[in-house]
Regions:
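Mid-domain Rossmann-like dinucleotide-binding core that forms the NAD(H)/NADP(H) cofactor-binding site
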Residues: 1-51
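Helix-to-beta-strand junctions that scaffold the AdoMet/dcAdoMet cofactor pocket
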Residues: 81-83
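Short acidic-hydrophobic, aromatic-tinged amphipathic segments that line or gate anion-handling sites
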Residues: 44-52, 142-149
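Glycine-centered, small-residue-biased loops immediately flanking beta-strands
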Residues: 85-86, 110
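A short acidic, Gly/Pro-enriched loop at the edge of an enzyme's catalytic core
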Residues: 55-64
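C-terminal hydrophobic helical "lid"/dimerization subdomain
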Residues: 32, 75-78, 120-169
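Residues in the short beta-alpha loop(s) of Rossmann-like NAD(P)-binding domains
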Residues: 30-31, 93, 118
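Rossmann-fold NAD(P)-binding glycine/threonine-rich loop
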Residues: 91-109, 121-128
Length: 169
């Protein structure tokens, strides 16, 4: 399962990559636009009540990706991870308190993976994988803006912004 949210593109890429690798993926989010993008990758879109509210977990997953960037999201992700499973926190949590249910992690033998990827290290492998698997990463792009209009582009509420500029020189 992927818990989408403020991490927007992170969760969508996670869902798309997992489906491309053959996984069945539930994508949980409150944003209809992101739910449609997740569905276009082949994930099962599940709408939640709002950005900060989550349903009580009714299914348990071997792997859960948290891209919510909210404290209630990380808690939901952990509580949705099955015994012996792995919960990956791939989004930023800026608050001083996230309320991670440590006892739940320990009693259910859940592996919690926290940290950001370092693109410089993995980029050649990732680009090779995208090419070999014909992964449609562009599905996540919701706005393409000319370089000169970058301030306007950054002012829009969008899932994934791409700035385009003609080659220099």
């Amino acid at each position: 399962m992927v818990v989408g949210g403020i991490g927007q593109a992170i969760g969508l890429y996670a869902a798309g990559i997992a489906v491309t690798c053959g996984a069945e993926v539930d994508y949980l989010d409150s944003c209809p636009r992101r739910l449609k993008i997740a569905e276009s990758f082949g994930a099962r879109a599940r709408q939640r009540p709002s950005l900060f509210r989550f349903p009580k977990p009714s299914e348990f997953y071997d792997v859960v990706i948290d891209a919510s960037s909210v404290a209630t999201g990380i808690t939901h992700a952990i509580r949705s991870t099955g015994t012996g499973g792995t919960c990956v926190v791939a989004s930023y949590h800026l608050g001083a308190y996230t309320g991670i249910p440590m006892m739940h992690l320990v009693l259910n033998d859940i592996n919690l993976v926290v940290g950001m990827n370092h693109p410089g290290t993995n980029l050649p492998d990732v680009l090779g994988w995208v090419h070999e698997n014909d992964f449609p990463a562009e599905k996540v792009t919701t706005e393409v803006v000319d370089w000169e209009d970058a301030p306007k582009g950054y002012g829009k509420r969008t899932t994934k912004l791409i700035l385009h500029r003609s080659p220099l020189g």
